[in-house]
Amino acid sequence: MLMKAHDSKFYRWLFSTPYRALHRAYEASKKVRNIQRDYLFYKNAVGDSSKRSFYNVTLYIDSILNQSASNIFWSLLEFKISINLCNFIVSLRDPHIDNEKSDFIFESFNKSTKENLENLVDLQKDKNLLSNERKNVISLNSYTRSFKQKIGNYINLLIGWKPKNEVNYLTENLSFTSSIEENCFFLKKFYNKTLDWERWNRKLTWIEAVLIDLELLKNKGWFSSEALSEQRNPQPFPNFNTSYKTVSLSGPFVERSKKMQKIGSRSKLNQNFSPYIDPGAGTYGSTTKEGSSGANSRKGNPFGRSVRGTEKVKDTAYESLGLVPRSITRTLSRFQTELAGRSASLVLPEFRLAKYQAITSIKYLAFLIFCPWLVLTVCKILFLEPLIENWWNTAQFQIFLSFSQEEKALKRLQQVEELLWLDIIMADSSAKQPQDLSAQIHQRTIDLVETYNQESIQTILHFFTNFLFIFVVISLLIWGKKRLAILNSWVQEVFYSLSDTMKAFFILLFTDLCIGFHSPHGWEILIGFILEHLGFSHNKHVISCFVSTFPVILDTVFKYWIFRHLNRISPSIVVSYHTMNE
């Protein structure tokens, strides 16, 4: 009985998979509609006076649209696969049923299923009759049949077909479930969902409209005049029977059930659904006269900005500076919003924007750190190190790359000889000591040669890995230009959200580290390490020239930034900085 109950649960789950997949795709399509509706509500509430991170809002919408499109794709793929699987299972019903009889079964699905439900309810009420009939039926443990016949009998029970011995057939197929109540519930659920083809077609039509919208926005963009003209003048849908290339409803599970109910006319569906997203529509999801007037009032621009031809929106991560400081315009905009009583409607969009901005920035920063390191490690272990080591040991006869390496090796060899002679002098004299000394010096020389040979290989390897690192980082910065803009905007937002005292503290900390009194010693150590890492000799003149010029240039740039930018954005920070510096 336990296996029978599991079989019943499996069939329930299998035949409800198309409904679950279609429902997920439908919910994802509604999310696409809702995200644009919320953004339009946010733009209408804020108005044109606010310039709140327009570029980041666009990126947020793109991310949500891409995620929803992916969910729709995989849900429709699951829907199609499950439909085909159900078609295959339906084709495995009792082999004694010919095609004409099976067509008759599907055409009379409504009537036979209701009768089957009534019979099950009658059997449930009359438990004595059911128990008596079960005594006349051979138990499942002693009755063997093929897997195809088991599934076929179960499907025949679902679709309402019954052989002549109706009571024995129902009783025998009830052994696939744990109780009659479960069969009644499942048959009702299967009956209600399968007959509702009108709802299926409406959901598929809605999903088709959303996919057309996403394709339009992806190919033509939000701000192109062609896309906006098509949004203002939507074209009717293509024929429903030929429009679905991604999801094709066919097979005995679908085609025969479609004979019971006719698909609604296209005029009715076109009245319920808008073929394109109309951002300026008054009633979202439908093309009404008020929506057309609303779109015309804003000239069809979903963001409330002027569009001239195919003019592109300037990619800026934050608002540019103008004659009026940005803080004043933001304060006036928020004050106007508070007076209009629209502040509550701005909390959720701003929270979503801040959350998206922070998560995207942290992910991109971690990606910039770990991705180059991972690429360099893999390339170094698998390709670069074996190739360079083989080339250096076979094609090159020299050991040292620079004169500084030879000097270091010579000094090291002299130190080894001096230590060995010191050991001989302090030890007892013997005749074999000169021979032992020569052998020890020879062995130490071989060790030094191997050490500096490996050091030369590592220097060449570092040279190539540094170029590879620079190439990977530049590629990531170019590829993630939008995310870099979000990271830049997020860092500025975090910095400007601090108090004036904390801002001045971090500015002082940075300046003292880079151009402070003790900074030249740090620069000397840093430049010397970089030169040694790249394989160059330690040149004091080059290091002194760099230390005497670069901090001065950096100090000049920093003072200009304070005078030109920070003094206009927040004068209080400059006052706090000078006070703490003094």
From Swiss-Prot:
A GO BP annotation: potassium ion transport
Gene Ontology MF: a single term: proton transmembrane transporter activity
Region (Disordered): 284-307
Residue ranges, annotated region (Insert): 183-316
Entry's transmembrane regions: 364-384, 460-480, 507-527, 543-563
CC annotations in GO: chloroplast inner membrane
Tagged with keyword Chloroplast: yes
Keyword Isomerase in annotation: no
Keywords of the record: Antiport, Chloroplast, Hydrogen ion transport, Ion transport, Membrane, Plastid, Plastid inner membrane, Potassium, Potassium transport, Transmembrane, Transmembrane helix, Transport
Membrane topology: Multi-pass membrane protein
Pfam families: CemA
Entry-linked HAMAP family: CemA_PxcA (MF_01308)
Main function: Contributes to K(+)/H(+) antiport activity by supporting proton efflux to control proton extrusion and homeostasis in chloroplasts in a light-dependent manner to modulate photosynthesis. Prevents excessive induction of non-photochemical quenching (NPQ) under continuous-light conditions. Indirectly promotes efficient inorganic carbon uptake into chloroplasts.
Family designation: Belongs to the CemA family.
Protein name: Potassium/proton antiporter CemA
Naturally occurring in which organism (per UniProt): Staurastrum punctulatum
Lineage: Eukaryota, Viridiplantae, Streptophyta, Zygnematophyceae, Zygnematophycidae
Gene: cemA
